[in-house]
Amino acid sequence: MLLQASQATQSVWKTLNKWLPPLSRDKDWWWKTLGPQINTLLTEADYDLNERYEALLLLYRWVVPEMGPRPRSSVAPSKSFMTDDHSPIEYSWKWISGNKKPEIRYAVELVSPLAGSKQDPFNQIPTRNLVYNLAKIIPELDLTWFEHFWHELLGPGSPTTSTSGVLTKGSTVFAALEMLHGHLSVKVYFIPVETPDFSAWHQIKHAIEASGCPNLEALNHVDAYLSSHDDGRQLRPFMLAIDLVEPAASRLKIYARSNQTSFRFVRDVMTIGGLRTDLDRSIEKFSDLWKRALGLDPDTPPEDELPKVDHLTSGAVFNFDVAPKSQIPEVKAYIPVRHYANNDLQAALGLIGYLEDHGHGGYSQSYLRGLDMLAPSGQLDQATGVQTYFAVACQGEDLSLTSYLNPQFYAAFQEPERT
């Protein structure tokens, strides 16, 4: 049974909406849709008043004006990589151990009015402008690696310029705004355009090697795993993410996908083929969470594959952090609840049951209220789609967990996918 949200939840957004200058029709729709959603998530995660005002003003000033046309049908005008229905924004809720306040983030692909044209064939201009504008306001942002990886992966000589007359089917860059309690952190994702001669992995690896990174040991471990290990060869890298901080402090996250879905495979990737040997206890916990989140029988053998799903984003997803501060990559796996759970409520209750059993369930009802706010009315226990992934990283004997949430702006025009 969901607890009812406080009547005061939207007071911050209502105050801002009352006094901020009016927006044009499309921008007004985005503001009146995203604003209450973000405000609800921040309120449920116990962000203080000033943090909520700042997050909403950032949204109003720098994000909403570049969101593009409002949804008018099930067909998105820009095929954003962000979500399965091409909604250009995805929220995340990071669970903090010890019942501490969760952290809220959203990743967003801004939409250029020139997207698909010769001037901006890969819809890159607004994200680049967002980064530059935020850097003027937040002096701690460091653009050293942003400039480097933009040049290497999207700049002159990259496939995005050599094929600039061709319309892209997907995204090449987007940003994430991490609203940590007390400050804002920014991350940028690069998705190289693959060609017959240059895979995404080839481009990402070369860009990291050319970055001046003082320690490539973690990268070399990933390269060896991908090329020489049976399970590693089942992975296809497709994206790189960096933090906008000084390079020595930044993460370097290489994202990879596989159509393999057994927990045995997931365990092998998490340990990098046995390279990491200190994860037995956390992997045991991960196995328990995997079964709960996906509604599997507790006795399901780790060799069993999940049911086959024919979709571009089906399968398992991972990221490898090859930052210079690490000699062995940190690995994160993404439980694909969007495609394999029974419904959103089942997946959420599986996650919450795990958290409560391990003493981390203090924000369970807050999370459920957030889901209820995002889900189409009456659909939380009828379909999947709001929760896309549960991200899992092994930290000592415990797990670090993050839920990813899709507001489904375009799916709202479709018949729900009932399970």
Curated annotation (Swiss-Prot):
Enzyme superclass (EC): transferase
Highest taxon in the source lineage: Eukaryota
Binding site for dimethylallyl diphosphate: 105, 187, 189, 251, 253, 255, 332, 334
UniProt keyword list: Transferase
GO molecular function: transferase activity, transferring alkyl or aryl (other than methyl) groups
Effect of a null allele: Impairs the production of r-N-DMAT and ac-r-N-DMAT.
Catalysed reactions, semicolon-separated: L-tyrosine + dimethylallyl diphosphate = 4-O-dimethylallyl-L-tyrosine + diphosphate
Residue numbers binding L-tryptophan: 81-82, 90, 257, 389
UniProt induction comment: Expression is negaticely regulated by the global nitrogen regulator areA.
InterPro entries (UniProt xref): Aro_prenylTrfase, Aro_prenylTrfase_DMATS, DMATS-type_fun
One BP term from GO: alkaloid metabolic process
Residues annotated for L-tyrosine binding in this entry: 81, 257, 389
Enzyme Commission numbers on file: 2.5.1.-, 2.5.1.122
Residues that span the membrane, as ranges: none
Key word Cell division present: no
Binding residue positions for (2E)-geranyl diphosphate: 105, 187, 189, 251, 253, 255, 332, 334, 404
Cross-referenced CDD domains: PT-DMATS_CymD (cd13929)
PANTHER family recorded: INDOLE PRENYLTRANSFERASE TDIB-RELATED, PRENYLTRANSFERASE ASQH1-RELATED
NCBIfam families: arom_pren_DMATS (TIGR03429)
Family: Belongs to the tryptophan dimethylallyltransferase family.
Role played: Dimethylallyltryptophan synthase; part of the DMATS1 gene cluster that mediates the biosynthesis of a reversely N-prenylated monomeric L-tryptophan (r-N-DMAT). DMATS1 catalyzes the reverse N-prenylation of L-Trp with DMAPP to yield N-dimethylallyl-L-tryptophan. DMATS1 exhibits unusually broad substrate specificity and can utilize geranyl diphosphate (GPP) or L-Tyr as an alternative prenyl donor or acceptor, respectively. Is able to catalyze both forward and reverse prenylation, i.e., at C1 or C3 of DMAPP; and it can catalyze C-N and C-O bond-forming reactions.
Name of the protein: Dimethylallyltryptophan synthase 1
Organism from which the protein derives: Gibberella fujikuroi (strain CBS 195.34 / IMI 58289 / NRRL A-6831)
Name of the gene encoding the protein in the UniProt record: DMATS1
